């Protein structure tokens, strides 16, 4: 598998996450769903401390945490929230690394085109 293919696993997983994120969703569940999606798309492991998805919400998005010390919080996503997902899929020792911040406003994921208009 090529590097660009591993990156596509991460990119497709972020797009998937945008379709499932909703208020009341627990960050632990979101992490699990993202990791399962990457495996479904072809990842065979996760290169960064065996964590496939670092997931943060609200004020947690401003904190930098080492993978060695990372613990997904037992927090739920709010109606108006900010969620950062940082993915680290691996396939055949080739790493992917992709992160995005997703904004929810009035329970809906805000599309970047809406922000620009």
Tell me the role of every PLM-derived stretch:
Residues 1-117:
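Active-site neighborhoods and metal-handling regions in enzymes and metal-associated proteins
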């Amino acid at each position: 598998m090529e590097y660009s293919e591993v990156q596509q696993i991460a990119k497709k997983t972020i797009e998937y996450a945008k379709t499932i994120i909703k208020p009341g969703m627990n960050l632990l569940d979101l992490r699990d769903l993202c990791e399962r999606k990457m495996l479904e798309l072809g990842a065979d492991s996760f290169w960064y401390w065996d964590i496939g998805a670092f997931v943060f919400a609200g004020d947690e998005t401003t904190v930098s945490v080492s993978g060695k010390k990372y613990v997904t919080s037992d927090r739920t996503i709010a109606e108006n929230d900010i969620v950062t997902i940082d993915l680290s899929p691996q396939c055949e020792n080739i790493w992917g690394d992709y992160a995005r911040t997703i904004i929810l406003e009035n329970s809906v994921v805000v599309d970047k085109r809406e922000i620009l208009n």
